[in-house]
A protein has these predicted regions:
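Charged, low-complexity surface segments at secondary-structure and domain boundaries
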Residues: 1, 61-64
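Auxiliary, metal-adjacent structural segments of Zn-dependent hydrolase domains
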Residues: 1-30, 91
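Secondary-structure boundary/capping motif
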Residues: 3, 52-53
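Short amphipathic alpha-helical patches
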Residues: 13, 34-42, 80-88
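Active-site scaffold of zinc-dependent metalloenzymes
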Residues: 26-51
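Post-HEXXH active-site segment of zinc metalloproteases
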Residues: 31, 51, 64-91
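Short alpha-helix carrying the canonical HExxH Zn2+-binding catalytic motif
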Residues: 53-62
Length: 91
């Protein structure tokens, strides 16, 4: 997976198609997702660079409820890529 703006846009699209709102806010907080008054919201730190945003979304997406059939084909492929990717091995 490439760490560029196109990948970030595709990840955001997966969440948007699953009825989540992706917001970028400033502050010293951990990125994450929450449900506020039945509204699905994913909040990311706006000071993260593109790679940080992508990594955060990759961490979040497996934990949110996404109805696979509601996604477009492109988003289904992206979701499959996230769910079935092997974790990076650190040396």
């Amino acid at each position: 997976m490439k760490y560029n703006q196109q990948t970030l846009n595709r990840l955001e699209k997966v969440l948007e198609e699953a009825s989540y709102v992706v917001r970028y806010e400033r502050g010293s907080f951990q990125s994450g997702y929450c449900i506020l008054e039945n509204k699905k919201v994913v909040v990311l730190n706006k000071f993260y660079n593109t790679e940080g945003r992508i990594n955060t979304l990759i961490d979040i997406i497996p934990h949110v409820i996404i109805i696979y059939e509601m996604l477009t084909t492109d988003s289904q492929k992206m979701l499959d890529e996230i769910k079935f990717q092997k974790p990076a091995v650190e040396n």
